[in-house]
């Protein structure tokens, strides 16, 4: 279980100094229907002849690498950058911090 705080003080390239950053998890955007590869694929698929390209079935990994999106909280900066961290099964953003010697309650 990886628990990352929602804010982090780190270097901002635009400001040129350490600033607090808002941390969110990166999500992939929706694929464009008009990208060259997509247009080519749709053209090839149309008409008779079934599936024209191989469908990938050999999945090797069980996890994805976590990518954090850091946004500077300075009002006139707001620059964003990505930061990749290691692979993990469970990822949590801004969860409760673990305490030493604390009694677990259910």
Curated annotation (Swiss-Prot):
Pfam families for the chain: Ribosomal_L44 (PF00935)
Coiled coil residues, start to end: none
GO biological process: translation
Compartments it resides in: Cytoplasm
PROSITE patterns: RIBOSOMAL_L44E
SUPFAM superfamilies linked: Zn-binding ribosomal proteins
GO cellular component annotations of the record: cytosol; cytosolic large ribosomal subunit; endoplasmic reticulum; nucleus; plasma membrane
InterPro entries attached to this UniProt entry: Ribosomal_eL44, Ribosomal_LSU_eL42, Ribosomal_zn-bd
The keyword Electron transport is assigned to this record: no
UniProt keyword annotations, A-Z: Cytoplasm, Methylation, Ribonucleoprotein, Ribosomal protein
Region annotation (Disordered) ranges: 26-53
Modified residues (N6-methyllysine): 53
A GO MF label: structural constituent of ribosome
Tissue specificity field: Ubiquitously expressed.
Keyword Membrane in record: no
Other comment: This gene has no introns in its coding regions, and therefore, was most likely produced by retrotransposition of the original X-linked gene during evolution.
Family affiliation: Belongs to the eukaryotic ribosomal protein eL42 family.
Name recorded for this polypeptide: Ribosomal protein eL42-like
